[in-house]
């Protein structure tokens, strides 16, 4: 087997292995097991004193308007 044939054989093997692995982690739009493999969300929350867009993102579950260092009123987690 010469060098060109060896390179072609390796490319074919790599393509086949890549397709098999891609099938295992394919996104499942129905929210099944494959979706759990691809999208892993860790429960995170915004700590106290940080800007908050929504109450549910704060660790304290509470967000109030406060004055910042520039004198502007912004929402911050309690």
From Swiss-Prot:
Disulfide bond sites: 45-59, 52-63, 58-77
Transmembrane segments: none
Keyword terms, alphabetized: Calcium channel impairing toxin, Cleavage on pair of basic residues, Disulfide bond, Ion channel impairing toxin, Knottin, Neurotoxin, Secreted, Signal, Toxin, Voltage-gated calcium channel impairing toxin, Voltage-gated sodium channel impairing toxin
Localization of this protein: Secreted
UniProt xrefs under SUPFAM superfamilies: omega toxin-like
Residue positions assigned to the propeptide: 23-41
Residues with site note (Critical for insecticidal activity): 51, 68, 76
GO molecular function: calcium channel inhibitor activity; sodium channel regulator activity; toxin activity
Tissue: Expressed by the venom gland.
Signal peptide: 1-22
Domains: entry comment: The presence of a 'disulfide through disulfide knot' structurally defines this protein as a knottin.
Family statement: Belongs to the neurotoxin 08 (Shiva) family. 01 (omega toxin) subfamily.
Protein name: Omega-hexatoxin-Ar1e
């Amino acid at each position: 087997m010469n060098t060109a044939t060896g390179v072609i054989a390796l490319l074919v093997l790599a393509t086949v292995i890549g397709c098999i692995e891609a099938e295992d982690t394919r996104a499942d739009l129905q929210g099944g097991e494959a979706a759990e493999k691809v999208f892993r969300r860790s429960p995170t929350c915004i700590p106290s004193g940080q800007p908050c867009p929504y109450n549910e993102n704060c660790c304290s579950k509470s967000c109030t308007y406060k004055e910042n260092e520039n004198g502007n009123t912004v929402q911050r987690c309690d």
